Amino acid sequence: MELGSDDFLPPPECPVFEPSWAEFRDPLGYIAKIRPIAEKSGICKIRPPADWQPPFAVEVDNFRFTPRIQRLNELEAQTRVKLNYLDQIAKFWEIQGSSLKIPNVERRILDLYSLSKIVVEEGGYETICKDRRWARVAQRLNYPPGKNIGSLLRSHYERIVYPYEMYQSGANLVQCNTRPFDNEEKDKEYKPHSIPLRQSVQPSKFNSYGRRAKRLQPDPEPTEEDIEKNPELKKLQIYGAGPKMMGLGLMAKDKTLRKKDKEGPECPPTVVVKEELGGDVKMESTSPKTFLEGKEELSHSPEPCTKMTMRLRRNHSNAQFIESYVCRMCSRGDEDDKLLLCDGCDDNYHIFCLLPPLPEIPKGVWRCPKCVMAECKRPPEAFGFEQATREYTLQSFGEMADSFKADYFNMPVHMVPTELVEKEFWRLVNSIEEDVTVEYGADIHSKEFGSGFPVSDSKRHLTPEEEEYATSGWNLNVMPVLEQSVLCHINADISGMKVPWLYVGMVFSAFCWHIEDHWSYSINYLHWGEPKTWYGVPSLAAEHLEEVMKKLTPELFDSQPDLLHQLVTLMNPNTLMSHGVPVVRTNQCAGEFVITFPRAYHSGFNQGYNFAEAVNFCTADWLPAGRQCIEHYRRLRRYCVFSHEELICKMAACPEKLDLNLAAAVHKEMFIMVQEERRLRKALLEKGITEAEREAFELLPDDERQCIKCKTTCFLSALACYDCPDGLVCLSHINDLCKCSSSRQYLRYRYTLDELPAMLHKLKVRAESFDTWANKVRVALEVEDGRKRSLEELRALESEARERRFPNSELLQRLKNCLSEAEACVSRALGLVSGQEAGPDRVAGLQMTLAELRDFLGQMNNLPCAMHQIGDVKGILEQVEAYQTEAREALVSQPSSPGLLQSLLERGQQLGVEVPEAQQLQRQVEQARWLDEVKRTLAPSARRGTLAIMRGLLVAGASVAPSPAVDKAQAELQELLTIAERWEEKAHLCLEARQKHPPATLEAIIHEAENIPVHLPNIQSLKEALAKARAWIADVDEIQNGDHYPCLDDLEGLVAVGRDLPVGLEELRQLELQVLTAHSWREKASKTFLKKNSCYTLLEVLCPCADAGSDSTKRSRWMEKELGLYKSDTELLGLSAQDLRDPGSVIVAFKEGEQKEKEGILQLRRTNSAKPSPLALLTTASSTASICVCGQVPAGVGALQCDLCQDWFHGRCVTVPRLLSSQRSSLPSSPLLAWWEWDTKFLCPLCMRSRRPRLETILALLVALQRLPVRLPEGEALQCLTERAISWQGRARQVLASEEVTALLGRLAELRQRLQAESKPEESLAYPSDGGEGTGNMPKVQGLLENGDSVTSPEKVATEEGSGKRDLELLSSILPQLSGPVLELPEATRAPLEELMMEGDLLEVTLDENHSIWQLLQAGQPPDLKRVQTLLELEKAERHGSRTRGRALERRRRRKVDRGGEPDDPAREELEPKRVRSSGPEAEEVQEEEELEEETGGEVPPVPFPNSGSPSIQEDQDGLEPVLEAGSDTSAPFSTLTSRLLMSCPQQPSLQQL
């Protein structure tokens, strides 16, 4: 978008007012207040208070309207004159059958109107040609010099303008006695001037608002068309700026030529206006010679652009027609072949008689000069805004408006500066080259569509907030009918004046220069949307503005004198200001008011999409302007909206209802009106008209009582005729009624001349009633007659002013102030009297001083009204003065009795007046009271006061009257307070110090502070802390000197209490050390027993399983522990916290727990043994039984049965044993066929709750426990567990040492040796030949089987994978060869072994006897091939996962190397998950031993398998009983247990050194 280069200079801003809430409550009063300032500018802006925000009350969904169409360059007066001229000249050429194109000169369209005006101003065409001043014409048209533009302008003028100007002058018309044209009739009523055919072009329903800025495009090829038959082509096509320039791209199609000579030239002469590049324009003609004398010769062009084609008349064969063909110019009929017949009037003209003469016979339609002139002078159609064809809602109009603005300015609507829109608006309205069309929803009736303000009616219920705005004076529905407004006396709802109009605007939509009807005020409120830009001219410059506009555009005002009243004409404010018209501007934003004053011209446009509401109102100061407006309308013969006389008379008929200022203004106006009416009726009598009749004009419609001459609405009187009943005139135009005789005319009147003065008198009484009242008030307030009026009389005067609605004058304000002051005095005097009666209990602070009492009495005497309360006040003053004298005497006589002073003080309080001596009395009394309080506080027998009391006494002492006794008491109080604060601070430091002081120091501080007679809170706190410390020490001594070592819980409680005490305690450090040692031991024990991330506590593991008998209970408890939901019960043995302190009770409870555990496991084994196996469950389709800790349905292959509880578990959910772990660790030389030594024993996680350390590991914990002076529940549980394990070990050794079992063990040894000896010849069978290596593979495989988990480098990864695979293949291959049992176990032997096996599996300790019994039981039954097969499958799956993880680790290592980082150790990465996933007792034992080695420094030696001949087994078994029975002494079990452990491990001499 390219904006114009002509800058618009904004006019100065109009006044802006921001009323306060007090001013805002009276709208018309505030407007009257600002009128002296704002009226000088014509318009002003008012910003309401910030919180005045009326709700928008329009029903948006139902609001539909049809806007007006506005073509911007039709609005501006000067632009419209140019476009009208272009219409006329285009019409001139069109009616002659020729087409016209507006040429471009210097890349801009030629302004033909300005060219014509300048030629006239320079002296005319002939003068300019004679003086060769065409260059000056080009200069005045702002063309650059030196480009021969003057010649171009002359050519264009000669071809286009000059013929039109000659026709307009009428120089070549025949002067004949023809009937005059219609427009020459005298007193013809002019129609409003406008642009022809504009309203015949309906706007398009689509794309109606596109900016047509680039319309000056290359000229289209001329199109031959029958213009007469095609009505569309008769319309004018635009090539310039606006819809008023006619379409100039068509040529008339040749019709039948009316020539006598068929041999005439085929191509008529043509005037050509041709546009060339660079603005160089030439005029060419197809004729070889020019047809205008004295003109320059022109070049020729074979391609004309503009043609004027004419034709000859028809050749008729009848002779009588030939005789009638006479030229209208020369009156001759010769050379009839040169005669032309006009298509309009059939007159004949010689082609050489025309001006200018035609060299040849023209073609097409031709009209004579007379017809051309008549057509050009035809009055145009009325100008006005067209209505759009589309109906909008607010939403659809807003979308259209925002879209138009955003597209036009190529930016979001809210980002377009208002200055840019303003400049662009005035550029567009002044341009004839661009045509922008917008729509404006103007003058929408709020009565029909609803107001934007809330309205109190019955249509809908209003909220309290809406009700407030509905009654506000600033509501535009309320303001016109306010009491001070004149329009409230008009009954009719005048739309636009009394009833608001609504305006929905879009960018560039404008309202033209105008003043309000009857020169009234107007107020406009912008509800929401983008700003509205206003321009205003004050009323003093209204006539100047009209003169300037008439001077600049006389063509418009000659035909329409009231053009400015039609709201269709703009003129640039800069143009007006350049001619001396004062103009102001403002941007009205949402929520702001704009007020225009009487006869203030205003105009403006909208910055974008918005919604405004406007209405008129009239105040008392408007009445003179309204009367002048009627006279102005009478001169312009404009219709009135209402009758001004009727309004005045209607207000005069009820003067009591008028505001006083309004009554005075109406009286003045009516006086002038009555005088004028007397003069006019007198003139009527002088004319001889005496007939009259009364007429109630207010009952007649306005159109029936309008003067037929000046259109004024009559009310007081009118002149009518009996013979011409259809019309009447006002008395100012009595000569214009009709031609009838005066005797037939009569006066129609509303009031007689006697009635009018009566009405005037009532107004005068109303207006002058204020003066009468004011005189009464003045006499009363000034006491001019020497008599004070009573209070009632003054109130009556004030009531009269209120009832008669007198104005708020200074005198009324004085009266109100006097009444207010008098009533205040009466009320105060009554309060003074009632205060004396109430006595000293009245409210403090209401007493007046003696000086105030004297002033009050003087104030009452000075008031202009009489009050009987003055005597009461005088009596009170006398009493106060007498009391003052007595008080002075009492104060002078020292020392006075305190009782006397107190009684005087109480008497003074009853007076109700503050006497200065009373304050001295009060100070003396307060001094005595303070000294007494200090004496009581410091007395030895008194209760000790607090520091706050001491400080309060010091503060109170500073305000009492000074005396030596007071000074001494203050000194004693200050000294005592200083000492007390010093000791309080010392105690505070002791309580808050980081380094705690010993009890002795605190005792010394407390002892010294006891001598201070003040209550010290910190010293008291120190006493309490010291008492708690002594009690704590006593508790420590008691617990340390008891029969047993103290429990850890007790010590922890004492430590917690001791740490909180602000006393340094030596015993606390000892207790903290003991607690720390106990915690360290418990942590070591936890590491020894508990698995990583175990869900069991140490105490739970060491104690017997309390819920071993219930499978569901165990499973649910295990699941809750895994989820972190289950919290273990500390009373695992069924003992309370107090019972746990007795070692004997703990041992007995542990024994009972063992028995319950055995019974429970037997019951559980019976229950689980009755369960079907997972394979059996698979065969039953409807089975929903669940197994394992996961609680899922059986998984088939991969399920294992626990050897202790006999329940089933998924191999993927639990840790499973490795088949060859025992082969590799303990018996590496045994052959694989010794299947009873395979590690196939499986204990579920519910049965194997801990790591199950060996006894030698437990021995170190017991030795450390024996050194602890603290008792732990875990320690005693460990002791009991060890006793239980040793007891089971003794019984197991006894059974293993029996002859039968010893023989069975020997048989197994022989069988193992025989299998070892037979293994070498079978190596070739076990491993088939591979690559030529037959028997050499077995040692390699055996080595791999022995060291399968020892991969330590990346090079061995592939080897390990191969060996692992071979291990599994080898085991799978030998399964069919397994057979058994290899031993025969008698039932007498098997039963004790199974019982021992079960009891040993319950122990959370690892014992070698357990393994020996397991091998015997395994060898005595067939091999469990199903379990072996399951273990093989699980191990295959695990190894496959290990290979996958290994490859991933290797890829990660390689990527790290590629990035330049240090590669990870693949062996370490591979072993880490294996150690985590390793299972079985051996794996856990390895992990356990590694951790224990870290704790003990690697001094844990291995314990060999005990032989059957151990002499200590029976001794250990026998020595256990006395230990279990003598549980009362804690030292005995520890010493005995340690010695028995040493006997159980005879090859560990180093244990004695522990």
Curated annotation (Swiss-Prot):
GO cellular component: cytoplasm; nucleus
Cofactor binding comment, as recorded: Binds 1 Fe(2+) ion per subunit.
Ranges annotated as PHD-type zinc finger: 326-372, 1187-1248
Record's compositionally biased regions (Polar residues): 197-207
Region called Disordered, residue ranges: 197-227, 284-303, 1319-1364, 1437-1535
JmjC domain span: 468-634
EC number(s) recorded for this UniProt protein: 1.14.11.67
Predominant localisation class: nucleus
Crosslinked residue numbers (Glycyl lysine isopeptide (Lys-Gly) (interchain with G-Cter in SUMO2)): 205, 229, 244, 274, 295, 1127
GO biological process, one term: negative regulation of transcription by RNA polymerase II
Compositionally biased region (Acidic residues): 1482-1497
Catalytic activity: N(6),N(6),N(6)-trimethyl-L-lysyl(4)-[histone H3] + 3 2-oxoglutarate + 3 O2 = L-lysyl(4)-[histone H3] + 3 formaldehyde + 3 succinate + 3 CO2
InterPro entries documented for this protein: ARID_dom, ARID_dom_sf, JmjC_dom, JmjN, KDM5_C-hel, Lys_sp_deMease-like_dom, Zinc_finger_PHD-type_CS, Znf_C5HC2
One term of GO molecular function: histone H3K4me/H3K4me2/H3K4me3 demethylase activity
Comp. bias (Basic residues): 1442-1457
Domain comment in the entry: The first PHD-type zinc finger domain recognizes and binds H3-K9Me3.
The name this protein goes by in its record: Lysine-specific demethylase 5C
Gene this protein is translated from: Kdm5c
